[in-house]
Amino acid sequence: PHKSEVIDGSNVKIKMSPPKFCDKPVNVYGFKGRHVDSGAQHFVVPVDSFSKINALCLAKKIRYSKHFSPKGINVNFFKKIGSNSIQVLTYEKGVERIMLSCGSGSVASAFYASILTEIGSGVIIQVSGGSLSLDFDSDWKNVWLSGAAILLFNSSLLIEDLQ
């Protein structure tokens, strides 16, 4: 179970699972990346640039590749955009779309980015839904993700309506 804290009215932080690599770097359809377990399985690919349209097509192809068969995998693309900031796009299996935000995908991307680049704790992660901040210790055992929590949808269902 995750621990969480309300920072203020709309900002929260959540303790995330420590990330770990599941294999050596692999090349899938010409994209070299790493399989990271950050509480969910992600294939993380560093890129110099990307578009959401290309990311959607490529991620779907990677997600269904035989390398990750039969279960498939979530796919993340990240690029470094500042001295301690990255941009992340996450394609989530099951939903089969690029997500506005994904906590485990952001952690997986920052974990791999910390190996490849000089980002550190306090890294800012730009996702389609806004900005997140990730704090972690040197061995990635104490990992906290912070950002705005926004209600996107609210619904109710009466059981009687189903009969």
Task: Write out the residue ranges for each language-model feature.
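Anionic-ligand binding region
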Residues: 21-36, 43-78
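Gly/Ser/Thr-rich beta-alpha loop segments that engage phosphate groups in nucleotides
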Residues: 41, 105-107, 149
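Residue-level signal for inorganic ion chemistry
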Residues: 14, 39, 78, 103, ...
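Acidic, low-complexity central loop/insert segments
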Residues: 1-37, 111-138, 142-143, 151, ...
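Conserved phosphate-donor
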Residues: 59-91, 96, 131-136
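A short Gly-Trp-Pro
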Residues: 65-67, 159-163
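Glycine/serine-rich anion-binding loops at beta->alpha junctions
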Residues: 91-111
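Pepsin/retropepsin-fold aspartyl endopeptidases
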Residues: 9, 78, 161-163
